[in-house]
């Protein structure tokens, strides 16, 4: 596997949640810098040595509501 994709959303209580597509990996963080570190750590803990993907893609999803 050369890449893993995480869907990142703003948590209702603040901060971010991130979940991997196709793998059972989930983490949360208070800010973007902390999120980067936690996602890297979660990926390295999930995969055996030498099996982790070379690239981690964070796809930020944000809902925006406007009046009609």
Predicted regions and their residues:
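Short, charged, surface-exposed hinge/linker loops at domain edges
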Residues: 1-5, 33, 37-68
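Short aromatic-glycine-(Arg/Gly/Cys) micro-motifs in beta-strand/loop hairpins
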Residues: 4, 8-20
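ATP/adenylate-binding site constellation spanning eukaryotic-like Ser/Thr protein kinases
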Residues: 13, 23, 40
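Residue-level signal for pocket-adjacent positions within structured domains
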Residues: 20-21, 51
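A short, exposed loop/beta-hairpin motif centered on an aromatic-Gly-Thr core
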Residues: 23-34
């Amino acid at each position: 596997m050369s890449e893993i994709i995480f869907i990142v959303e703003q948590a209702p209580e603040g901060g971010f949640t991130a979940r991997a597509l196709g793998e059972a990996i989930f983490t949360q963080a208070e800010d973007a810098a902390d999120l980067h570190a936690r996602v890297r750590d979660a990926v390295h803990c999930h995969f055996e040595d030498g099996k982790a993907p070379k690239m981690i893609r964070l796809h930020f999803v944000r809902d925006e509501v406007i009046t009609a």
